[in-house]
Each structure stands twice: as structure tokens, then as C-alpha cells.
């Protein structure tokens, strides 16, 4: 997710950087390192050595694969998406930054190839996803610690598994954790065509909630509207329509939302607040407009509106690995029942990463870029 303003940037564990040390500098075993051999390795990865424009700093490198032993797991990556948070991390504008050089990618799905003698929770053939961000999923294969992985069922679609660990988890937690919503209650959200937005629509529909979905007025507005309604959206309005006085009559027929989900900020978040029911909550999980969230004194005093933030990485820190696994299994049940699908995706071979990076940063591109290995 895009995050604006100065953030407190914690550093990912040191072993992330150790995985990419040149052979001459390695002092202990690591999951992978830059190949010191002139012969290309069979392990390829998208690596960045400093922060900046992803198209300029990300390179396709050959890495060495460490031996599998102890609690290590050899994973062949199958697919990994490019999320806004991945772009922010490469740019250096995120709340968690791995040590450099680093492999890009925080999300994806892989298949276990081999396990060390101390591994008890996974076996060859299992599908796995990262337990936490910063693992570096834009690579063909790697050796990870068992604790860095979570198993997922292999009977769900590959694209769903590859995009399971970030956006659907964020959507579910925001719908469940901030307001006690009952069937037929309304929520309102901006950036409705984003990965989180599409997951919100589907999970809300599965829970009997109504969604009011705000979009920018784009050239393909009708196509986006049809897509969201096919996912279960009840209402789709543009940013411009939301500002019009006619919205008062709209909310005579539709209950005012008790929950607003903001990924934009600026004027867009101001409009979400304006239409919230008294006592309602706006949860901010991104800032695509790179503008502050502004609430009036009257909204806070007379409507008692609540402003909250959500970051999945912090939620994971505050909850146990078993609770995250339970969340993943809950989402997998929705996928199996046909109530949660992956966002529209474009699969791009790893070697064509520049095309994927460019598409992922272009406006009005609603298809998520997924790197295939």
C-alpha cells in the first residue's frame, strides 16, 4: 500500500541481508548469496542494492542456493505479485526495510522441494507462503527457515494462493476488528478497484454487508463498475458524485455507513468522513494521494467519529503465528466456496520484470502484475 509522510522505519532481521552477501564476505551459512562463479546459477532473483526507482535499481541476478539442513526448507517459487508495498519498500518509503542488498517481493506462493532433518511442520510438495514481509519472493527458489513459512492448501487456484497473504488479510481484519457490523450494515471505501478493495467487496458480501465503493472517474469507469458489481458490490460511485448534494437523497435509501476504509487520503478521505454515520470509524491503511487525512472539529465532537490506522505487519506482531494461520485458513474456506477470488491478474515471466514493474506503477492499470517463475 502507498504510504505518505515520514514513517518510523524498522529494519528487517539481519539475515535478510546476509542471504545476499558475496561469497568472499560470507562468514556463516545463508539462504542465498550473490554467485561468485562465472557460470550462471540456476537460481535467479530480482535484487536491489540501494533504494530508488524500481525500474532503475532492480536487477535480475544469479544467486547461490544454500544447502538444506536443520530447520531449513528448500522452496521453488511458483508465483509472486507486485504490490504497492513492494514498490514502496524498494523506494525506501515503507515502515519496514530489509538490509541491502535485498530480493524484492513480500508475497507469493512456492512449493516445498526438500526439508532439513529438524523440520516438522512442512513436507515436500506442500504449498507455502511467507509468514512475514521482507522474505524476498521475486526469485525462482530459495532456502528459508521453517518459521518463515506458512502452509496453504494446494487445492485453491495458484493466483489466489499467490495473492493471499497481504490484501485479503488486510481486508478481513479491517472488516472484523473495528466495528461490530451486522448483516445489511453499510461500509464505504475508496480505491475500491485495488486488491484490498476487491477483497473487501467479496468478504463483505459473504458476511451480508452492503458496500458503497468509490472510484476515480477513469476512461474505463463502466468496465470497472461492472467488474466490482460482479464481485458483489452494491453501489459504485465516483469521487465527483460523492461530493454532490444529491448524495443526501442516496443515503435516505441506503443506511449511512458505520465503517469507512481509506487508502487515498486528502479530499477523498474527507468525503468518506462526511458520509459516515455518527459514532462511525474510518480506518486508514494507505495514502495513495500522498495528502494528509483531515477531520473537522465538528466531526469529532458532534458526530464522535473515530480515526484509526491499520498495518498488517503490526497486526502480525501483536498476534501469534497460530492466529495468522487461522486467518489464512478462514480466507481459504471463502476461496473454496467461491466467495473470494484473486484480483484481475496479468502473469509476467520473471525475465520480463521491467514490463511488470512499469505496469504496476502506471495509473488506470487495474490488473495486478504477477511474476511467474
From Swiss-Prot:
Q: What is its EC number?
A: 1.3.1.104
Keywords noted in UniProt: Acetylation, Fatty acid biosynthesis, Fatty acid metabolism, Lipid biosynthesis, Lipid metabolism, Mitochondrion, NADP, Oxidoreductase, Transit peptide
* Compartment annotation: Mitochondrion
Location of N6-acetyllysine modifications: 61, 252, 267
What Gene Ontology molecular function terms does this protein carry? enoyl-[acyl-carrier-protein] reductase (NADPH) activity
Q: Catalysed reaction(s)?
A: a 2,3-saturated acyl-[ACP] + NADP(+) = a (2E)-enoyl-[ACP] + NADPH + H(+); (2E)-butenoyl-[ACP] + NADPH + H(+) = butanoyl-[ACP] + NADP(+); (2E)-hexenoyl-[ACP] + NADPH + H(+) = hexanoyl-[ACP] + NADP(+); (2E)-octenoyl-[ACP] + NADPH + H(+) = octanoyl-[ACP] + NADP(+)
Q: Which residue interval is the transit peptide? A: 1-53
Question: Which residues catalyse the reaction?
Answer: 94
Q: What class of enzyme is it?
A: oxidoreductase
One cellular component (GO) term of this entry? membrane
One GO biological process term = fatty acid metabolic process
Where primarily located? mitochondrion
Quote the record's binding site residues for NADP(+): 167, 193-196, 216-218, 285-288, 310-312, 368
Q: Which residues carry this modification: N6-succinyllysine?
A: 61, 252, 267, 316
SMART domains linked to this entry: PKS_ER
Disulphide-bridged cysteine pairs: none
Tell me, in a sentence or two, what this protein's role is. Catalyzes the NADPH-dependent reduction of trans-2-enoyl thioesters in mitochondrial fatty acid synthesis (fatty acid synthesis type II). Fatty acid chain elongation in mitochondria uses acyl carrier protein (ACP) as an acyl group carrier, but the enzyme accepts both ACP and CoA thioesters as substrates in vitro. Displays a preference for medium-chain over short- and long-chain substrates. May provide the octanoyl chain used for lipoic acid biosynthesis, regulating protein lipoylation and mitochondrial respiratory activity particularly in Purkinje cells.
Quaternary state and interactors: Homodimer.
Family membership noted in the UniProt record: Belongs to the zinc-containing alcohol dehydrogenase family. Quinone oxidoreductase subfamily.
Name used for this protein in its record: Enoyl-[acyl-carrier-protein] reductase, mitochondrial
